[in-house]
Amino acid sequence: VQWTAEEKQLITGLWGKVNVADCGAEALARLLIVYPWTQRFFASFGNLSSATAVIGNPMVRAHGKKVLTSFGEAVKNLDSIKSTFAQLSELHCDKLHVDPENFRLLGDILIIVLAAHFSKDFTPEAQQAWAKLVRAVAHALARKYH
């Protein structure tokens, strides 16, 4: 993926404001609520029976933070996203058998969460840069499947 200086600035500038714990928890909770079939990958998380249960679930919160912390590695390594996520791609494909479409869904939700939290900063240009980034991350995570 080729990045312009403006795209890099829009991504890193916004990322510096992100509360990884809060935005990560919200993004994963939204994924599990909006796309309930994704819950099957999180059976060990306990009660996911309602939106309230998902939002209040400490394991969802903790894993959301872990997911978004990992996403931060893409921000730090914009020019080497594929290699950055090689091991995670292998884990999600070979061991967890996650449908790669879920990576795209989570990326779409992350954009919604960022837009909600940073509406002034989330200009159409920022959205375009972030859309490019979440596509690149989803593609890198799905790489082992191809």
UniProtKB/Swiss-Prot annotation:
GO terms for cellular component: blood microparticle; haptoglobin-hemoglobin complex; hemoglobin complex. Involved in oxygen transport from the lung to the various peripheral tissues. Heme b binds at H63, H92. The keyword Nucleotide-binding does not apply. Residues 2-146 form the Globin domain. InterPro entries: Globin (IPR000971), Globin-like_sf (IPR009050), Globin/Proto (IPR012292), Hemoglobin_b (IPR002337), Hemoglobin_oxygen_transport (IPR050056). It comes from the Eukaryota. The lineage of its organism: Eukaryota, Metazoa, Chordata, Craniata, Vertebrata. Belongs to the globin family. One of its GO terms (biological process) is hydrogen peroxide catabolic process. Keywords: Heme, Iron, Metal-binding, Oxygen transport, Transport. Red blood cells. Heterotetramer of two alpha chains and two beta chains. CDD domains: Hb-beta-like. GO terms for molecular function: haptoglobin binding; heme binding; metal ion binding; organic acid binding; oxygen binding; oxygen carrier activity; peroxidase activity. Gene3D superfamilies: Globins (1.10.490.10). This is Hemoglobin subunit beta.
